[in-house]
């Protein structure tokens, strides 16, 4: 079970089922301990399903199911489907611009968003 704190909207709150289903379909098990995810800063509303992928990967990394040594270099965004697939998101270009401004090496986004995000120079 995991809990989201930090002003998530209803779509972000609903990510719970998408993440659990996607992880299970892809052969991962949810950690057995309770997980609290702090989406800081708490005063800024988090909207949309694009947080699904980073939340899922963060949980896998925190539980040491996957190695996380390179994750901090990349910004991850994407919606997870109940069937475990990665779905496109809105706004990948402005997200990519911000990722470059913040010094990320690259972005991991759904294939359908790759061309738009690739417009930004100096970002893998």
Task: Give the ranges of each region predicted by the language model.
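Peripheral, non-AAA+ core regions of ATP-driven protein-machinery
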Residues: 1-124
């Amino acid at each position: 079970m995991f809990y989201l704190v930090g002003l998530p909207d209803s779509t972000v709150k609903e990510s719970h089922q998408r993440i659990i289903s996607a992880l299970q379909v892809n052969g991962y098990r949810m950690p057995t301990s309770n997980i609290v995810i702090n989406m800081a800063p708490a005063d800024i509303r988090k909207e949309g399903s694009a947080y699904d992928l980073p939340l899922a990967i963060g949980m896998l990394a925190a539980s040491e199911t996957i190695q996380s040594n390179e994750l901090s270099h990349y910004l991850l965004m994407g919606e997870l489907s109940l069937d475990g697939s990665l779905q496109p998101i809105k706004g990948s270009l402005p997200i990519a611009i911000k990722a470059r401004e913040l010094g990320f090496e690259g972005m991991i986004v759904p294939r359908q968003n790759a061309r738009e995000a690739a417009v930004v120079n100096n970002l893998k």
